[in-house]
A protein has these predicted regions:
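Short acidic/polar segment at the start of the alpha1 helix of CheY-like receiver
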Residues: 11-15
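Charged docking surfaces used in two-component/phosphorelay signaling
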Residues: 16-24
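Short hydrophobic/Thr-rich beta-strand motif most characteristic of the beta2 strand and flanking loop
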Residues: 26-33, 41
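Acidic catalytic/metal-coordinating carboxylates
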Residues: 34-37, 60-63
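Active-site residues of response regulator receiver
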Residues: 53
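Receiver (REC) domain active-site loop signature in two-component systems and cognate sites
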Residues: 56
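Alpha4 helix (beta4-alpha4-beta5 surface) of REC/receiver domains from two-component response regulators
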Residues: 63, 83-100, 105, 109
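Hydrophobic/aromatic residues positioned on beta-strands within the core alpha/beta folds
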Residues: 78-82
Length: 117
């Protein structure tokens, strides 16, 4: 059974590129264009990993993560952002974080590393 990944990014091109790369590796991928939509999807389906942009309309990655913690969801998380200082300011420096623009194959390597655990 393939691993399930949720890709959350309000930047359409970035989201589609990440999703395409993951599908090429035979992962099952869902997409959300903002944090609120991500929460709706997370309520309906379990994921092995969420790749989430930090700054988005409606709800940020921090809001999504807070909700996931309150619901005891055990989904692994990778953050992507153009504002890496926000990750440290919100106490999430223990999470893997890729600063935009980043190498897609570095991201793919991290995905594989997380999902084999």
């Amino acid at each position: 059974m393939s691993k399930k990944i949720l890709v959350v990014d309000n930047e359409l091109r970035s989201r589609q590129l990440i999703a395409h790369l993951l599908r090429e590796e035979n992962y099952e991928v869902d997409e959300a264009d903002d944090g609120a939509t991500a929460l709706e999807i997370l309520e309906k389906k379990n994921f092995d990993l969420m790749i989430c942009d930090v700054v988005m309309p409606r709800l940020s990655a921090f809001d999504v993560i807070d909700h996931m913690k309150s619901r005891s969801l055990s989904t692994s998380i990778i953050l992507i952002t153009g504002h890496s200082y926000l990750v440290a300011e919100n106490g999430l420096e223990s999470l893997p974080c890729f600063k935009k623009p980043f190498n897609m194959y570095d991201l793919l390597h991290k995905v594989k590393e997380i999902l084999v655990k």
